[in-house]
Amino acid sequence: MSRFEVVKTGSSASGAPPTTQKNVPHRNGEPNPSAKALQEKFPSAIERVEVVWGETVVFVDAWSVHEVIRWLHDDESQRYDFLSDVTAVEYRDAEVPIEVVWHLRSLPFRRFLRIKAQLQKGTALEIESVYDIYRSADWLERECFDMFGIRFRGHPDLRRILMWEQYREGYPLRKDFPLRGRFSRSEQLRQALAQNPEARYSMEELSIADAFAELPEDMRERLSKGERTGE
Amino acid sequence: MGLSAPSDRDVVSYTPEGQEGWVATRLDFLVNWARANSLWPMPFGTACCAIEFMATAASDFDLARFGMERMSFSPRQADVLICAGRVPFKLAPIIRRIWQQMPQPKWSISMGACASTGGMFDNYAVVQGIDTIIPVDVYVPGCPPRPEGLIYGIRMLQEKVKNERAADKGTRDEMEPDPSSQLYIPPSLIDELGEPFGNSVNQTRSGL
Amino acid sequence: MTRRTVNVELSTTGLDAQGRPQRVPILTDDGGGLALQAPPGIEPDLEGEHMLINIGPQHPATHGVLRLVLELDGETVVRCIPHIGYLHCGFEKIGEYRQYNQIICWTDREDYLNSIGNNVAFALGAERLFGIEITERCKVLRVIASELSRIMSHLVWLGTFCIDIGAFTPFLWAFQRREEIYRLLEKWVGARLTTSATRVGGMAADIPSGWMDGLRQFIRTFPHTLDEIDRVLTKNAIWVGRTVGLGVMTPEEAVNWGLSGPMLRASGVDYDVRKDFPYLDYETYDFDVPVGTNGDVYDRYLVRFEELKQSVRILQQAADRLPDGPVNIDDPRIILPPKSKATSEMESMIHHFKVVMEGPRPPIGESYVAVESPKGEKGYYMVSDGTAKPVRWRIRPPSFVNLAAIPKMVEGHLLSDVIAINASIDIVMGEIDR
């Protein structure tokens, strides 16, 4: 019998009820108390803390991100239970590294925190996945991979989500990817039409349906070597 | 010098035997009247234009008075493919397959700017006009077109249907581009012809 | 502020002893109450292979171009694999090549049911990035715009949800109401659906004279339609039978899966961005946030229905408190100067030229502003490097994260329930795929 108790947001928050923020300063505003707690708990992993337009941004070393986010989720004084977004930012300046951004919300404490990790361009763009902490990271990280090419270690099913799987032009949101794509319009159309809409079942789906056992021998061999039929 | 004798090629024949008889024209009229007033649309609705299409089908603008209230979502039972909304490259084979599944006689309406030309989405992801994938009969401009605009486009299509003649042999033929015909333009030539207008390889547009 | 939450109670049966959702049978001769009885013993499905079927991407009931691959055991869904991306149009990429005021046109098209609400959300984000405070009149107008768009979006959801379950008439009633809102928007900004009504620092236009009368007329007559739909649906045994007990998400699961909006509130978590991280002075408006207790499709319906009523309440208050004064801020570097000045004074002409050709330039920084869209927590994350075009424009799409939970929600349900559950998420593919 499903009947749930109403979970009130801000049950652990102190102070007055929230109001619309007005006249927020550009820099050096009041930081989120979690930033101080993080600096005390992980002094080596936290590179710096900024407050931009009232939002606290914590720069974390890329190798410790998972540990930090796990602590933010589990610790009773932090309880960041809602992962709002996982995304990445590439700047126009070629020297500046790519930043992976996590937007976390603590519903009991009514707090908002932005965690950033920097990945140097030219190295392999890889970072830990937070799928085991937040299920919402599943599709958000897949999209980040699709658009930027950032691999999330530990993600169970990292494949393209918005573009089709054999998309060959690259990772669209990178700055070296031109707005209209790398190929000409006719080539893009030809590649798009070359996909066969009916042969779009992936390995996973064919194996579910036991159709795999009925496929011809050579096709089964090719599929098990990793060739994709479609999606 | 002077006038040369007219060759056979230049003379158009209007002999009575070449024209249709009274029965054929009446039959054409009947068939076209029936087709035009009961076009069953297949709403291939993807984005905002689909909402305006739904508003056109709803009470205030009412497509039912044109015989189009029966939306057939199965292409095999449809007459008109109304592509309402932007079509990305991932969706391109789908719309092509849907078009191929529709039986003749079939028409298509490209509703909105994005279906007609790619609209405001001149980028890597969107097909720049579905007429690169399927043949289009009527283009309805707008972003999204007002319901009155769509109805105007539907009326234009009805006029087109009414002007078809059974004697025109080639109208209802499915055409696939035949590489050996002179109508086929190879992709390299397309790229060359389109170059002054900028394409993704050369990015000759003004940085917009 | 009075009561914070409205507990919506209904005695549902939920799950039976085998853990399957219970069905409420069609009313026989009870005459009055709902006959909630346990269904007869469920026969086990015949032994056999699982079937793989494909729904979409072209399908009337998928609310856009969504493809669901279902593994079925008879008619029960064992697994569901959704595929999206069929409407991916590169919004975020193109945002890097457009000025901030130009991006407002794109925000209409992504969640096209909530277009003016998206305009408001983007303008708030851009104003945070620029460090601008907008005028009081603009704030109230934006609240009116957001609530009108909430009503529009919920009406489409209601209409299409009803069609998916099988009831066609509420669709026509809902769209007729929407036409009234369309007429109001057309008088205000000139467009029905793709409004582009806001600008950085203000609105594209102030409301014309006589517009408020039209709004009050709408506020007066809209609750009658809601009552009509309520009479037809809420206690209807077929409706209840088709929606109760489906797609249940517990509160902890819902928060962990990142659900927001009515999906989350139907599961019992009362997170509403308007109350918890307020914007546009929402804390000064008196309204309730409906919260369900069962987390099923029926509760989502009740929550959205109640939200429609609350939106009317907010509109009434906003209409009463609309102050006079300018709509746009007085900074000519950001917002266009009035045409009379631009054609007569040199300085205004230069400002006009700069704002149109180059666009307003914010300081270096970033901002993330989230609003409560009808679908959930909608956020625009913008990063600026000092130029007129953003470095990164990220849309946090609520439907994207909500839809990711569909494999969890449809497991164990029947094929026809998949359609009902899919409809209850209220997805907009334009926002999911961007």
Language model region names:
Chain C
Residues T2-R434:
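Metal/cofactor-centered catalytic core regions of large enzymes
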